Amino acid sequence: MGTKLKKSNNDITIFSENEYNEIVEMLRDYSNGDNLEFEVSFKNINYPNFMRITEHYINITPENKIESNNYLDISLIFPDKNVYRVSLFNQEQIGEFITKFSKASSNDISRYIVSLDPSDDIEIVYKNRGSGKLIGIDNWAITIKSTEEIPLVAGKSKISKPKITGSERIMYRYKTRYSFTINKNSRIDITDVKSSPIIWKLMTVPSNYELELELINKIDINTLESELLNVFMIIQDTKIPISKAESDTVVEEYRNLLNVRQTNNLDSRNVISVNSNHIINFIPNRYAVTDKADGERYFLFSLNSGIYLLSINLTVKKLNIPVLEKRYQNMLIDGEYIKTTGHDLFMVFDVIFAEGTDYRYDNTYSLPKRIIIINNIIDKCFGNLIPFNDYTDKHNNLELDSIKTYYKSELSNYWKNFKNRLNKSTDLFITRKLYLVPYGIDSSEIFMYADMIWKLYVYNELTPYQLDGIIYTPINSPYLIRGGIDAYDTIPMEYKWKPPSQNSIDFYIRFKKDVSGADAVYYDNSVERAEGKPYKICLLYVGLNKQGQEIPIQFKVNGVEQTANIYTKDGEATDINGNAINDNTVVEFVFDTLKIDMDDSYKWIPIRTRYDKTESVQKYHKRYGNNLQIANRIWKTITNPITEDIISSLGDPTTFNKEITLLSDFRDTKYNKQALTYYQKNTSNAAGMRAFNNWIKSNMITTYCRDGSKVLDIGCGRGGDLIKFINAGVEFYVGIDIDNNGLYVINDSANNRYKNLKKTIQNIPPMYFINADARGLFTLEAQEKILPGMPDFNKSLINKYLVGNKYDTINCQFTIHYYLSDELSWNNFCKNINNQLKDNGYLLITSFDGNLIHNKLKGKQKLSSSYTDNRGNKNIFFEINKIYSDTDKVGLGMAIDLYNSLISNPGTYIREYLVFPEFLEKSLKEKCGLELVESDLFYNIFNTYKNYFKKTYNEYGMTDVSSKKHSEIREFYLSLEGNANNDIEIDIARASFKLAMLNRYYVFRKTSTINITEPSRIVNELNNRIDLGKFIMPYFRTNNMFIDLDNVDTDINRVYRNIRNKYRTTRPHVYLIKHNINENRLEDIYLSNNKLDFSKIKNGSDPKVLLIYKSPDKQFYPLYYQNYQSMPFDLDQIYLPDKKKYLLDSDRIINDLNILINLTEKIKNIPQLS
């Protein structure tokens, strides 16, 4: 009868004929009864199901139809199985009850329970089991029951309280329940339950998870079955739910096909994290490459009963796809199940069994042959083979540049066609993964493909799904490779590469307990981290196979058992997305290698719960996170990662050998690579140099981020510059960084800095922090490809503050070198600048000067400086290793590896790219419409302000903060001259000086026209703030002086005669200013002592001022000023329309000069010149 009533869901039937009749009768009784409860309980709900089902109903149920409660059920179970249940809803009352009765007798507890009366916080129900019915449907793992429930209502109850005889049993159940009223007929209850007959054990027992569908209205059996099928669709995550019998049959068919009788997991190919040994010894010319999507691995299994997906744990999903023809039945193919917005995909990357052939160990079927078989399956079975032409289909020559250009175009066309086909699909879209197989013409070829795939798919957004990494598959091996974990470094395996930020270890976790058995809570007393903030200590376990059984053991690094200190929110330990993480589950962690000065327990950061592995632990007591040996291997990739930049360098034939040499020389040593993020260590070393760098940044920010500015800070890191923007009076600030940990997770994150600043500073501007990568476009779609798994609040910030928003100033301090790695990254960065910067807005940049480093490294491999510590050991302060070749064209992709002892652990190198001033100025003008306003070397600023900083701060009336910074910089200057407390300080100062003087700053403005006579605003602002006599700066545009670039000469006399001839009729009052540079050699860097000399030329009745400036490169320039003391100020009088130049500025120039002369105290002794 049941089968005849089904009219949907592929005629799926839940009830047998007998069950059907019994349930009809139960529904009739429910409709006629007053106090009957009718509910369906779903068995075998594990933690992954619990989380997925909860999330599903939260997303589809209106907020006013959702209830959540935490309460304690105390049930008195009588010999006749009837139940008297008291529910306590007040958490304080629950705590008091547990404390009071933890050691009491059962009789005392029973008498207390019966003494309670119903109230707002107490609910009492009597369950009459004798009046109910129960049907178990094992084939669908559900129980259908009806029970009489009589609530006790104060003063209205029809039943009396039970008498305590001592024969009662007590059961305690602490519940966290979510209730969803999904329609007018039914309610879904999802409950996390801790059950125990012993009260004091209640909070220590593991959770069970319950799912119930309860009727709230009268319905017929067809409606009930339809409701149940809808729930099964959610539980099984499929449109076609299947019974336990069908699932068991599919698993049995799979085991028989592959002759793997005892397994509870897929017999799939192992994929291991790639390391330098694999790159050096195995991958070149022997591997193909494809992308790894952010999806789940499944086998697709074709049978005569349908097509199914088998998960790692042999969970079965049935697909809504017609049965294939007989030749393609008993077929197994390996792939990724990928969910995207609006479409689901299954991407096949290998074949296991097809048309009677087992491909697992057959060496005659290499990868290229299996690819042909996969293509045929996709075409014949699913009709989704999208054409992709091999290079040799259209070309005869094998040249890397031609191949690269061809595949870039072919991939773009392929994915365009792919998306068109996908958008037309209404069901699961099944197609192939695309492999690029090298021709073997150069060892760099495979890495060229890997670099191309990653950048085009991620930063150019070619794919409709997010990437999780790159897969390297051996060309000449069968599907399965024989060899255990011990052989992973001795034979070719399949390798997985992930960006270093996503290298993670899966741990089985247990929280430390207190004396009561509950999770222990500790409080952080560190002011630097989070004073007084509560946290839990999480013990981190991995799996170890011992005598054929897997057991969890605590993960160790250098013999130290690893733990994670996880801060709590509302009493719950949470992952980075704010989701609670629970005891006895498997959680994915990343390790923040940038927290250099913190204990390891603060560096482990939980990313997400791994529900698949948690399920495996709960079902089979297997997969306690990663296996120990696998975890150790991943740890090596965390501490010595293969970065995107290394892959890119390996993909360039001109730098391949050099990169291989670096990987070989430093393999398993302290030469580590770190990408895209670095932060200053908490150290007193080179405090003067750091203060000097910050002083320059402060003045840039204060000058160009004026009151009311809206600022976008690209590469804001952990917010070290926030106070600078606050002091500048900005109105609104948005900081962007690729490192989400530095923005939000760690204790000294940008967000935490902002919160702390708000406590001490009034009227602080709104500041927001967005996890984003400027190498991709600032759109949500683009950023989700680069940073998969970002939380919803970050998506909201991108849409709100990046998409369609423009800023007065964009700040980019010491990060632009990351965006010059390749053309695609640079183009995206420039598009972002163009899209986000207002007209007439400013772009502020600091970076190494590429010309300086390029010149110093000509014919050399490295540039470094060192110092001797207090133990007499010589330490490298910084080292730059040249990755590029001297023959490379200056511009993009000029790679160096930088070790900086201030930001990195010993041996940790950061890949950067040289920033060449000429390239930067030309490219930003062409791509963004930016004009250079001003730029100079830190070296020149350093020399210019030497006299100022060598004076004590007391002479300037500074604030305490300013005086501290001034003092640090002053000591830096003095140390360089040998005037310090000890030789170590002198040594460190000189070593740090060599690093700092490699830097340059730039200010660009977004405007189509710019006046070359515009002054150096940074210098003017500096001078105003320090109230110091104005120095003549080594700039072309400085202190509102106009420099006549047309009359530059190396002969001062010719310049002077030119001025005299030009202004013969004005009888000028002339001063000749000579900028003398006395050079002191310090290793290969020169210290310059500036000296200003003045010569009085001639007096006049209506004096004019003419100046000659000698630049550091020994060029002489005429400078023009005119004093309008005898006439009112009029802009028209100082502007030369015919030359479109300002001849002079107002009284301020003369005032500046007078101050300068007075400060020198030389005016009285200046000789007259005829």
UniProtKB/Swiss-Prot annotation:
<feature type="site" description="mRNA cap binding">
    <location>
        <position position="753"/>
    </location>
</feature>
<dbReference type="InterPro" id="IPR029063">
    <property type="entry name" value="SAM-dependent_MTases_sf"/>
</dbReference>
<keyword id="KW-0342">GTP-binding</keyword>
<feature type="binding site">
    <location>
        <position position="737"/>
    </location>
    <ligand>
        <name>S-adenosyl-L-methionine</name>
    </ligand>
</feature>
<keyword id="KW-0511">Multifunctional enzyme</keyword>
<dbReference type="GO" id="GO:0003723">
    <property type="term" value="F:RNA binding"/>
</dbReference>
<comment type="function">
    <text>Responsible for methylating the 5'-cap structure of mRNAs.</text>
</comment>
<keyword id="KW-0506">mRNA capping</keyword>
<feature type="active site" description="N6-GMP-lysine intermediate">
    <location>
        <position position="292"/>
    </location>
</feature>
<dbReference type="InterPro" id="IPR033469">
    <property type="entry name" value="CYTH-like_dom_sf"/>
</dbReference>
<dbReference type="GO" id="GO:0044423">
    <property type="term" value="C:virion component"/>
</dbReference>
<feature type="binding site">
    <location>
        <begin position="813"/>
        <end position="815"/>
    </location>
    <ligand>
        <name>S-adenosyl-L-methionine</name>
    </ligand>
</feature>
<feature type="domain" description="mRNA cap 0 methyltransferase">
    <location>
        <begin position="684"/>
        <end position="1007"/>
    </location>
</feature>
<dbReference type="InterPro" id="IPR039753">
    <property type="entry name" value="RG7MT1"/>
</dbReference>
<feature type="binding site">
    <location>
        <begin position="693"/>
        <end position="694"/>
    </location>
    <ligand>
        <name>mRNA</name>
    </ligand>
</feature>
<feature type="binding site">
    <location>
        <position position="715"/>
    </location>
    <ligand>
        <name>S-adenosyl-L-methionine</name>
    </ligand>
</feature>
<keyword id="KW-0547">Nucleotide-binding</keyword>
<keyword id="KW-0489">Methyltransferase</keyword>
<protein>
    <recommendedName>
        <fullName>Probable mRNA-capping enzyme</fullName>
        <ecNumber>3.6.1.74</ecNumber>
        <ecNumber>2.7.7.50</ecNumber>
        <ecNumber>2.1.1.56</ecNumber>
    </recommendedName>
</protein>
<feature type="binding site">
    <location>
        <position position="697"/>
    </location>
    <ligand>
        <name>S-adenosyl-L-methionine</name>
    </ligand>
</feature>
<dbReference type="InterPro" id="IPR004971">
    <property type="entry name" value="mRNA_G-N7_MeTrfase_dom"/>
</dbReference>
<comment type="similarity">
    <text>In the N-terminal section; belongs to the dsDNA virus mRNA guanylyltransferase family.</text>
</comment>
<dbReference type="GO" id="GO:0004482">
    <property type="term" value="F:mRNA 5'-cap (guanine-N7-)-methyltransferase activity"/>
</dbReference>
<dbReference type="InterPro" id="IPR004206">
    <property type="entry name" value="mRNA_triPase_Cet1"/>
</dbReference>
<keyword id="KW-0946">Virion</keyword>
<feature type="site" description="mRNA cap binding">
    <location>
        <position position="912"/>
    </location>
</feature>
<keyword id="KW-0694">RNA-binding</keyword>
<keyword id="KW-0548">Nucleotidyltransferase</keyword>
<keyword id="KW-0378">Hydrolase</keyword>
<comment type="pathway">
    <text>mRNA processing; mRNA capping.</text>
</comment>
<feature type="site" description="mRNA cap binding">
    <location>
        <position position="817"/>
    </location>
</feature>
<dbReference type="InterPro" id="IPR012340">
    <property type="entry name" value="NA-bd_OB-fold"/>
</dbReference>
<dbReference type="Pfam" id="PF03291">
    <property type="entry name" value="mRNA_G-N7_MeTrfase"/>
</dbReference>
<dbReference type="GO" id="GO:0140818">
    <property type="term" value="F:mRNA 5'-triphosphate monophosphatase activity"/>
</dbReference>
<dbReference type="GO" id="GO:0004484">
    <property type="term" value="F:mRNA guanylyltransferase activity"/>
</dbReference>
<keyword id="KW-0808">Transferase</keyword>
<comment type="similarity">
    <text>In the C-terminal section; belongs to the class I-like SAM-binding methyltransferase superfamily. mRNA cap 0 methyltransferase family.</text>
</comment>
<dbReference type="GO" id="GO:0004651">
    <property type="term" value="F:polynucleotide 5'-phosphatase activity"/>
</dbReference>
<keyword id="KW-0949">S-adenosyl-L-methionine</keyword>
<keyword id="KW-0507">mRNA processing</keyword>
<feature type="site" description="mRNA cap binding">
    <location>
        <position position="724"/>
    </location>
</feature>
<dbReference type="InterPro" id="IPR037009">
    <property type="entry name" value="mRNA_triPase_Cet1_sf"/>
</dbReference>
